[in-house]
Amino acid sequence: MKVQPVLVNKDNYSYLVIDEKNKVAIAIDPCEPNKVISSLSSISSDIKINSVFTTHHHWDHAGGNNLIKTIIKDINVYGRDERFEGITKKLENNEVLKIGSLKIKTLDAPAHTSSHVLYLIEDENEPNQVKSLFTGDTLFIGGCGRLFEGNPEQMYNALYNVIGKLPDNTLVYVGHEYTLKNLEFAKTLESENENKELYNFYDQCKEKLANGEFTVPSSIAQEKLINPFMRCHLPSIYNHYLKENPNSINPPSPIDVLGFIRSLKDKF
């Protein structure tokens, strides 16, 4: 299994997940289909996209679905509900599909939108290969999505109980290249003495971007080290909440802390 990021719409990530043995590929959030198809053509002329998997209904993720259906006849377009443009099949939570040797599991993660889903993908022909998680606008490198249709409790559940309980070595492929901005915010919450890993990781990501490289993938282990929204249970993060809410229980609810730092990030 090969994962090829495709930068579209300035800072969106679409992805090709390629089963090279069976010469089949799936596209994740191909909002600019021609760029995604061109990227695959540069890899191989023999591999064809047969399915689209969409994380949520926003135009910069689902907005290419109808177009790709006109380019690739009989393509399957998967999503969670009728708001997902052009879907041909509605998926359910924990539903598993097999395409070639790829096994794709749908995980509900309502928060950014009420029907947002994640896709956990592995290659059955490569049992020792690390799984890959496609998070759309739920989890970003160093951040999380805005709560347009959900609430802090739902985002906490998505980050801690859905994503956070997957194996730490799971690779994370996010929906936007927001990495440096997210890490700059994270650095306002934790000093270098409190989180040396955060500052080292920021420098690494800055160098990657300067060299024309992607910052994806991250990993769940990495996010637990540097992402403030997955560190709400730690004093270095929740002390900011306590300063503004001195009458709160100590330690405070990590859900309340997440909501608080999300409101700070909204204004950052």
Curated annotation (Swiss-Prot):
How, per the record, is the cofactor bound?
Binds 2 Zn(2+) ions per subunit.
As recorded in UniProt, its EC number(s) are: 3.1.2.6
The UniProt annotation places Zn(2+) 1 binding at H56, H58, H112, D137
What keyword terms does UniProt attach to this protein? Hydrolase, Metal-binding, Zinc
Q: List this protein's GO terms for biological process.
A: methylglyoxal catabolic process to D-lactate via S-lactoyl-glutathione
What's the stated role of this polypeptide?
Thiolesterase that catalyzes the hydrolysis of S-D-lactoyl-glutathione to form glutathione and D-lactic acid.
This entry's Gene Ontology molecular function terms read: hydroxyacylglutathione hydrolase activity; metal ion binding
**Known pathway:** Secondary metabolite metabolism; methylglyoxal degradation; (R)-lactate from methylglyoxal: step 2/2
Name the record gives this protein: Hydroxyacylglutathione hydrolase
**SMART domains the UniProt entry points to:** Lactamase_B
Cofactor(s) the protein requires to work: Zn(2+)
